[in-house]
Amino acid sequence: CCLQRELNLPHDTVCFDLNAACTGFLYALHTMECLLNASERKYGLVIGAENLSRITNWKDRGTCILFGDGAGAVVVECRPEWPSISAILGCHGTDQMLRVPGVEKGVPSLIYMEGTKVFKFAVEAVPYCIDQVLAKTGKTVDDVDFFVFHQANARIIDLAAKKYHIPPEKYYKNIQKYGNTSAASIPLVISELHEMGTVGPGSRVLI
């Protein structure tokens, strides 16, 4: 609702928060596509924003050096003649590798992450998701113009690129500038790629 006010949008504008941490932007993007296709509205604004410094434990050197604050946004338009977004969504809640203890009780607390477990999970999950999306769309790695990876860890990105033989000019890293900005990570990458002219109308992008 703050955005509706600040942007002076009509009162029938649909505004809501979606909290899904690092997957937040992807969930929001898919949700926006569903909303646009189910209504007569033409455009949607998807924003990924994080202020992780508020919940960072600055005494935990294994965690505090990883995260950063950031925000990015994209305008989404859906047309009948355009292909829809082919999304693979899911969750893995059996092992609390990344958590903010006390949140469920409304107690202010700081973020905690088991870095080794998260790394091992991501190294397996990223290729799995790539395989699923390519299989769903009937495309190959060569058909993809650009790969937009969540900027959580440079090694995870490099391992995925090595596994699929993705050339350096087809993926991008900015984690060295901002750290892991969670839900803001992907729109920040998209914004920089757009500014550089790397992706544009008609680009086939795997996020």
How should these model regions be labeled?
Residues 58-124, 128-131, 204:
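Condensing-enzyme catalytic core mediating Claisen C-C bond formation in acyl metabolism
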Residues 125-136, 159, 163, 189:
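Phosphate/ATP-binding catalytic cores across multiple sugar-kinase/actin-like superfamilies
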Residues 1-9, 45-52, 99-105, 156-167:
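Acidic-glycine-rich active-site phosphate/pyrophosphate-binding loop
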Residues 128-145, 193-198:
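Phosphate/pyrophosphate-binding loops at sites that engage ATP/ADP/AMP, CoA/4′-phosphopantetheine
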Residues 10-12, 18-40, 145-207:
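Claisen-condensing/thiolase-fold acyl-transfer catalytic domains that form or cleave C-C bonds
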Residues 35-70:
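Flexible, glycine-rich active-site loops centered on histidine and acidic residues
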